[in-house]
Amino acid sequence: IESGTEILDLGTPNDLSKFIASSGYTVHNTKGENLDTDFQPYLDTGVDCITAFEIFEHMLAPFNILSQLKTQKLIASVPLKLWFASAYWNTKDDWDKHYHEFEQKQFDFLLEKSGWVVKDRLIWASPDPKKIGLRPLLRYFTPRYYMVYCERA
């Protein structure tokens, strides 16, 4: 994505969207709306690219917004499902729950069915050296995050 590109980041401002803005891009963020139901204002914004960093796992139906976005480019990341851990679920905050933790093939299928073609992908692990135990050890070797660059089909 060329420097100076105008981007809509689905989600409230975060460290990554701030970094992107500081790198020469114009970044607009959503305002914390429920994007399962209140996504219409963001469908045709005229931006060059949409980013969505770890929001689709929080949505009940990400297909709805993914299939209707009018932009031609999408960069999105999701946490991958871990075989040794259950989905994240904050009992005190309805916005902080993972309704979906995708396998790579599931997220690719969602993107395909909503009209996107994955052009590039990146998968990485996310170890936490401060924690001790079997699960923290497995996080050194098990892919945890998945990011894709897509274009409209």
Language-model-detected regions and their locations in the chain:
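Conserved class I S-adenosyl-L-methionine
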Residues: 4-13
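Conserved acidic residues
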Residues: 5, 48, 72
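A conserved beta-strand element that flanks and buttresses the S-adenosyl-L-methionine
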Residues: 51
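S-adenosyl-L-methionine-dependent methyltransferase catalytic module, highlighting the catalytic core
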Residues: 12-19, 60-153
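Adenosine-cofactor binding site in Rossmann-like domains, unifying the SAM/SAH pocket
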Residues: 21-44
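A short His-aromatic
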Residues: 54-58
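Hydrophobic anchor at the start of a short beta-strand
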Residues: 7, 27-30, 74, 118-119
